[in-house]
């Protein structure tokens, strides 16, 4: 049997919001596998849904810039929120996004080698790090290309804590911006149901089936329950099926269609998502500084 540490139990409790004994029981039953433990708790009806474990740690800004038929969305990290509001840092983020839209590099390493008035983007980042006094890094970026009768829309929430980029076929830029605002607020995972991978559907169907079985319903009722809950799940993660944030009486797809278009693609960056915050023991830090 796998050894279940207190740290692992706490991680599961923080992730899904269950009691200590339930968390430990689930981890023991699944031999310490975090993902299987989450499913175990959901299937038992102890937890209805798993909360994301992405503890936002890094600060910084995301930005969207466009050049001709290319749009770029970038995330640049700093160590503190204070630096993220620094004008020099803001200008640096915009410069990076603009250069990425212009040059369309293959990856982060290639982006850092792009030419700038002071040398390369990497040189600019190093200089900003030295002047501002905090580590600054280009974490990620993505680009979209538009064709004839296609429109970009972008939206920055809280000055760039969340950035959304949308590509519509048809409609217009104003509609695209409205959809980008929705993407920033609601955080869909896919454009439509057809994009949801089969393994995601199979996994959710299995969990929902076991959850329904645990409620002691007849088989025919269970099938209907699972179908209904699966449809609800798909509507929650598919942009086209979501209730449009500015008019909940219609879906995003219907809103865009009313403007003569359809959603082709979107990208959403939330600063620091997926990066675990480093916790520092202040007393221990002082002891290290004193060489103890």
From Swiss-Prot:
UniProt xrefs under InterPro entries: EF-Ts_dimer_sf, Transl_elong_EFTs/EF1B, Transl_elong_EFTs/EF1B_dimer, Transl_elong_Ts_CS, UBA-like_sf
Family statement drawn from the similarity comment of this UniProt entry: Belongs to the EF-Ts family.
Subcellular location: Cytoplasm
Listed Pfam families: EF_TS
GO function terms (MF aspect): translation elongation factor activity
Region listing for Involved in Mg(2+) ion dislocation from EF-Tu, in residue ranges: 80-83
Major localisation: cytoplasm
One CC-aspect GO term: cytoplasm
Role: Associates with the EF-Tu.GDP complex and induces the exchange of GDP to GTP. It remains bound to the aminoacyl-tRNA.EF-Tu.GTP complex up to the GTP hydrolysis stage on the ribosome.
Source species, domain of life: Bacteria
Protein name per Swiss-Prot or TrEMBL: Elongation factor Ts
Gene: tsf
Organism: Pediococcus pentosaceus (strain ATCC 25745 / CCUG 21536 / LMG 10740 / 183-1w)
PANTHER family referenced in this protein's UniProt entry, alphabetically: ELONGATION FACTOR TS, ELONGATION FACTOR TS, MITOCHONDRIAL
């Amino acid at each position: 049997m796998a050894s279940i540490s207190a740290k692992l139990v706490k991680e599961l409790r923080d992730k899904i919001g269950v009691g200590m004994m339930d968390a430990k029981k689930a981890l023991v039953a699944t031999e310490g596998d975090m993902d299987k433990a989450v499913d175990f708790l959901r299937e038992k009806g102890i937890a209805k849904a798993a909360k994301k474990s992405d503890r936002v740690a890094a600060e910084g800004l995301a930005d969207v810039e466009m050049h001709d038929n290319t749009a770029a969305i970038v995330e640049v990290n700093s160590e503190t929120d204070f630096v993220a509001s620094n004008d020099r840092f803001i200008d640096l983020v915009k410069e990076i996004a603009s250069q990425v839209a212009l040059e369309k590099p293959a990856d982060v390493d290639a982006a850092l080698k792009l030419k700038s008035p002071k040398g390369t983007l990497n040189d600019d980042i190093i200089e900003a790090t030295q002047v501002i006094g905090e580590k600054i890094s280009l974490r990620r970026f993505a680009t979209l290309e538009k064709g004839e009768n296609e429109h970009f829309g972008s939206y920055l929430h809280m000055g760039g804590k969340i950035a959304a980029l949308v590509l519509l076929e048809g409609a217009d830029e104003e509609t695209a911006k409205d959809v980008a605002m929705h993407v920033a607020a609601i955080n869909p995972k896919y454009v439509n149901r057809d994009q949801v991978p089969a393994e995601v559907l199979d996994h959710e169907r299995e969990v929902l089936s076991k959850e329904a079985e645990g409620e002691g319903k007849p088989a025919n009722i269970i099938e209907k329950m699972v179908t209904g809950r699966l449809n609800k799940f798909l509507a929650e993660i598919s942009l086209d099926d979501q209730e449009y944030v500015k008019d909940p009486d219609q879906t995003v797809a219907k809103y865009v269609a009313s403007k003569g278009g359809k959603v082709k693609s979107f990208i959403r960056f939330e600063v620091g998502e997926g990066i675990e915050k480093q916790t520092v023991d202040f007393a221990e830090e002082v002891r290290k500084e004193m060489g103890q």
